[in-house]
Amino acid sequence: MADANAMEGEKSIPTKIPHWRQVTDPGAVTPEIINYPYPGSGTEADPYLVQWIPSDPRNPMNYSAVKKWSITFVVAIATLAVALISSAYTGGAIEIAQEFHADAEVITLGVSLFVLGFAIGPLIWAPMSELFGRQLLFFGTYLALTAFNAGAAGSPNMATLLVLRFFAGSFGSSPLTNAGGVIADMFPASHRGLAMGIFAIAPFLGPVLGPVIGGFLGESAGWRWVEGFLAIFSGVVWIIGSIFLPETYPPVLLRKRAQRLSKLTGKVYASRMDIEQGKLSIGQAFKTALMRPWILLFREPIVLLLSTYMAIVYGTLYMLFSAFPVVYQQHRGWSPGIGGLAFLGVLGGILAAMVINLLDNKRYAKVSKEYNGFAPPEERLPVAIIGGIAIPIGLFWFAWTNGPQIHWIVSIIASAPFGFGMVLVFLSLMNYLIDAYTIYAASVLAANSVLRSLFGAAFPLFTRYMYQNLGIHWASTIPAFLALACVPFPFLFYIYGANIRKRCKFAGEADAFMQKLMQANSAHLESDLEVSEAGPIPRRNSLEAREVLDRIQSARSGLTRTRTAATVEYEGNPYDIDRVNTGLSRVSTTNSQTR
C-alpha cells in the first residue's frame, strides 16, 4: 500500500509554495508534504522520518533556473560587497590621518583589522549556519555589517573607527563562508561550475574595485562619505537579500518541516538526518569548527604548504593597498582617485584568469569522465602551475618598472600577470585541497581561510616601513621572491602528490574513503544491471551505495569551485563543518534524501 501511495505521489505535481512564503516560513508545507507516506509509525520510539518528497517544491535543487541564478547573483554581490568594503577605506586614508592626527601605520590598521575579522567566518559563522540555517545568519550578520559601517562614518576618534572596522569585518565575513554553501544547496556538482565561478571571483574583484570607488569618493566628498556609502551599499544588499534569499540549507529545512508536521498532525516526526546521525549540538559544532582546522593545518604538510602559498599571494594583494599609494601618489603625485585606477591592471588579469578557468573546467570535465567521475586530485593542478609562474613574473616586472622615470602604464600592465596568476592559483589549489581531503574539506578550507586572513591582515602593516627603508624597487621585489620560492609547489604535488597523500593521515583516510566510493559505484552499476534483467527488486545495499556516490560527487564540485568540498555534516557541501566518519556505513546513513 505504501508503495502504491509512493508511486501515486511521484505522478502527482506538488502544490507550489510562493516565494514570499518560502522566505518568511521555512517550515511551510503543502497537502502533498503532509500526506506523504514517510517511513516510521509516528511514535516517540519510531517517529516518521522526514525527507524530501518527489518533486518537492521546497527542495532547493528543484528551484527554477531563474530562481537559482537570481539567488546566485545576490550571494555573489553580497560577497563582493564585503571584499570591496575591506579596501575602499583606503580612499579616505589621507583625510582620516589629517583629522585624527594618526600615523600611516595606525591608518593601515583599518584595513588589517577588517581583514583579520575574515578569520572569524569559518570558525564562528560556519557552525552557526549549521545550527540555525543560512537565511537567519545572513539577515543578522549583514544587518550588523551595515550598522558597523554606519557607525564608522560617524566615528569621533581613531580608536572607535578601528574597533568598528574590526567588527564590520567579523560580521561581514559571513557571506565568504556561507554564500558558497547556498550555491551548493541549489546546484548538483555537475552544474555547479559556472555558479561557483561567479561566486569565486567576488573576493578578488571586491578588493580591486574598492580603491577605485573609495579614492574618487574620498577626494570629492570626504572619508566619512566613503564609510557612509559603504553603509548604504551594504544596507541595500541586506534589503535585497532579505527579500530574495529563502532558507536553502536542507537539514534546517527538514528539521523545521518535521516540527510543523508534528504540530499539525499530533504525530511524532523527525528529520531523517537528526535521527540517523544525531542532532548536532552547539558544543559539537564549535568543537569541530574551532579545533580540526588547526589539527589539519599543522599535521598535514599538504595543507600547510599550499595554504602558506595561498596566504602569501593573498597577503601580497592586500600589501598592494599600501604599496600603490606610495608608488603612484607619493612618487608620481597622483590623487587618491586616480591612484585607485592603478588597480585596473590587476582587474584585467583577474578577468583573463576567469576565462582560462572556464576553459580549464571543460578540460577537467573530460578528464573526470575518463576516470568515471573519480579523477585524481592532481588533475586540478595544471592551471596552478601556469598561475604560479605568472605571479613572480608580474611582481618582478612591477618592482623594476614602478619608478617615476618609467611611464606609468608599464608598471600597471605589469600588475596584470599578478592578478591573472593569483586567481588561477587560488581556484586550482582550492579545488585540489577539496578533492584531496573530501570528507575533511570544510576543515581544510577553514584552516586555509584563517591563515590567509592572518597574512592579509599582517602584510599591510609592514609595507610602508619596507618601502621607506628599502625603496620602491627592492621593497616590491621581496614578495616576488616569496612567490618565486613557491613556484615548485604545484609541480611537486602534480608529480608526487598521490604518494604524498598516502603518507598523510587525513589525506590517506580521504583517499581510502574515495576508494570505497569507487567500489560502491561499481556495486551500484552491477545492481542496476541485475535490476534491469530481473525487475525492480529492492536492494538496500545498492541504494546506500548510490546515495553515498551522489553525496561525494556533490562534494567534488569545482568552482567547480574552489569548492569546496566535503564538509560539514557530510552532505558533500564543502562549506559545512565536518562531522562525519570515514566509514562507508556511517556516511551512507546520511543519505541524499536529506538534500
From Swiss-Prot:
Belongs to the major facilitator superfamily. DHA1 family. Polyamines/proton antiporter (TC 2.A.1.2.16) subfamily. It is a multi-pass membrane protein. MFS-type efflux pump involved in the modulation susceptibility to fluconazole and voriconazole, 2 azoles with similar molecular structure. This is MFS-type efflux pump MFS2. Induction: Is slightly over-expressed in strain TIMM20092, and azole-resistant strain isolated in Switzerland. One of its GO terms (cellular component) is plasma membrane. Keywords: Cell membrane, Glycoprotein, Membrane, Transmembrane, Transmembrane helix, Transport. GO terms for molecular function: transmembrane transporter activity. SUPFAM superfamilies: MFS general substrate transporter (SSF103473). Glycans are attached at N62. PANTHER family: MAJOR FACILITATOR SUPERFAMILY, MAJOR FACILITATOR SUPERFAMILY (MFS) PROFILE DOMAIN-CONTAINING PROTEIN. It is found in: Cell membrane. The keyword Nucleotidyltransferase does not apply. The chain crosses the membrane at residues 69-89, 106-126, 136-156, 166-186, 197-217, 225-245, 301-321, 336-356, 381-401, 409-429, 442-462, 478-498. The keyword Ribonucleoprotein does not apply. InterPro entries: MFS, MFS_dom, MFS_trans_sf. Pfam families: MFS_1.
